[in-house]
Amino acid sequence: MSVREQLRNYLFETLMPAKRDAWPADDSDLFDAGLDSLRLMQLLVFVEKEIKVTLPDHEVSPDRIESVNALVEWIESHR
């Protein structure tokens, strides 16, 4: 399963299941779609545990976490 698929599955099935049927495109803003700071932390833990990529805390910034596309790019840069 690709990083994109893993992220989408986790976001839609675990973190924000109510958004699953009307989920925006991968370049849409995750915070506008309902992601909050608690869910973001859960997502970053998921990336470390399940995708096996450690994302440095000092690199967390709005442009890296604003969309599925941005997250995939950031994760792939640390593989």
What are these regions (language model features)?
Residues Q6, D29, F46, A70:
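Residue-level recognition of oxygen-bearing side chains
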Residues M41-R64:
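Phosphopantetheinylated carrier protein domains
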Residues E66-E73:
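Short, cationic-aromatic polyanion-contact patches
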Residues V3, A25-D26, S61, S67:
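A diffuse structural propensity rather than consistent per-protein peaks
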Residues M1-D21, E73-R79:
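Thiotemplate assembly-line natural product biosynthesis machinery
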Residues L15-A33, K52-E59:
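Phosphopantetheine carrier-protein modules
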Residues S37:
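Catalytic nucleophile serine of serine hydrolases
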